[in-house]
From Swiss-Prot:
NCBIfam families: PRK00575.1 (NF001854), tatAE (TIGR01411). This is Sec-independent protein translocase protein TatA. It comes from the Bacteria. Residues 46-56 have a biased composition (Basic and acidic residues). One of its GO terms (biological process) is protein transport by the Tat complex. It is a single-pass membrane protein. GO terms for cellular component: TAT protein transport complex. Coiled coil: none annotated. Part of the twin-arginine translocation (Tat) system that transports large folded proteins containing a characteristic twin-arginine motif in their signal peptide across membranes. TatA could form the protein-conducting channel of the Tat system. The chain crosses the membrane at residues 1-21. Keywords: Cell membrane, Membrane, Protein transport, Translocation, Transmembrane, Transmembrane helix, Transport. Belongs to the TatA/E family. It is found in: Cell membrane.
Length: 81
């Protein structure tokens, strides 16, 4: 139960033979094989490209830090008497 029995495969093959004819089946299988081969080669090519595009870890740049805070100003409130 749940799997295909041998007689299921016989029915599937018979349907293919009736639909496509015995002469067209080898050509259909050949073109399906070519399509699968092209598909696999494209997947391998995409994986090779994605491995080359991996981001490299960032390297810190050594730089001098400049103190940008203003010095504290002294109070200019002078009392004149």
């Amino acid at each position: 139960m749940g799997g295909l029995q041998p007689w299921h495969w016989v029915i599937v093959i018979a349907v293919f033979v009736l639909l496509f004819g015995a002469k067209k089946l080898p050509d259909a299988a050949r073109s399906l094989g070519k399509s699968m081969r092209i598909f696999k080669s494209e997947i391998k090519e995409m994986q090779a490209e994605s491995k080359g595009d991996e981001p490299k870890p960032a390297t810190p740049i050594a730089s001098e830090r400049v103190d940008t805070t203003a010095p504290e100003q002294q109070s200019t409130d002078r009392h004149t008497a």
